């Protein structure tokens, strides 16, 4: 599956920013994700962006890693003074406690459960004590409600709060969690999406946040 992921994102690299985030749908998600990261990370900390892609969220890290050479090439053009490398998240070769924090967006939705467990352990080794790991995964509750089933590896993974706690309990403590895209963005007319966003942000922090499309988890290393 790794080769499929690599090839998929290599093929998308040139048009990725434009097609995924250069429209009102992508902007909607980008605003929500940035809002959450800003709450927890300082841009001058020694942070690692795992699966950094074209560098969309690299303003919060000095280091980035991605499996796609073509995505990394674009990230380097956008952030020439940052340490960005091609690599596999399951084979991170950094010293223990090298980073203050780490984060990863739009990666875990593609992986299998056994890979998640391995990654949580690996990241716990390279992040210092009390450091944060911020990540997003599709909401299992939302998909159960909408009866959504992915037809390929892309975005297939999903998880709920109890499962997340179980597979991270050995190395991480859950600090908080937030929703992303509570409302089905594709059903909201483009002209009014920016007006719906504040209400969406509110719902993503409410008692109903687990019903959002994705959940962003804030973990602290034990």
Put a short name on every predicted segment.
Residues 117-129:
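A short glycine-rich, Lys/Arg-flanked "PGG" loop and its adjoining helix->strand segment in the class I
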Residues 130-137:
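Conserved beta-strand signature within the Rossmann-like core of class I S-adenosyl-L-methionine
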Residues 176-222:
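A C-terminal cap/extension of S-adenosyl-L-methionine-dependent methyltransferases
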Residues 106-110:
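Short catalytic micro-motifs in class I SAM-dependent methyltransferases
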Residues 1-41:
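Conserved class I S-adenosyl-L-methionine
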Residues 48, 53-91:
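Class I SAM-dependent methyltransferase SAM/SAH-binding core
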Residues 147-163:
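Acceptor-substrate binding/catalytic loop of class I
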Residues 103:
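A conserved beta-strand element that flanks and buttresses the S-adenosyl-L-methionine
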């Amino acid at each position: 599956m790794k080769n499929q992921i690599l090839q998929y994102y290599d093929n998308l690299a040139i048009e990725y920013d434009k097609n995924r985030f250069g429209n009102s749908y992508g902007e909607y998600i980008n605003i929500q994700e940035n809002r959450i990261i800003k709450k927890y990370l300082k841009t001058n900390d020694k942070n690692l962006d795992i699966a950094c892609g074209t560098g969309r969220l690299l303003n919060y890290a000095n280091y980035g890693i991605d499996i796609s050479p073509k995505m990394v090439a674009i990230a380097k053009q956008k952030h020439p003074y940052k340490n960005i490398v091609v690599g596999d998240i399951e084979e991170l070769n950094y010293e223990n406690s090298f980073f203050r924090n780490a984060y990863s967006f739009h990666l875990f939705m593609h992986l299998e459960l056994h890979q998640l467990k391995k990654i949580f352990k690996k990241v716990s080794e390279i992040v210092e004590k009390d450091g944060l790991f911020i990540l997003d995964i599709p909401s299992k509750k939302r998909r159960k409600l909408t009866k959504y089933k992915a037809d390929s590896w892309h975005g297939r993974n999903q998880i709920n709060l109890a499962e997340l706690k179980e597979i991270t309990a050995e190395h991480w403590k859950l600090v908080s969690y937030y929703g992303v895209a509570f409302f089905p963005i594709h059903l909201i007319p483009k002209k009014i999406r920016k007006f719906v966003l504040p209400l969406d942000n509110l719902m993503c922090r409410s008692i109903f946040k687990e019903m959002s499309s994705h959940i962003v988890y804030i973990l602290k290393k034990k």
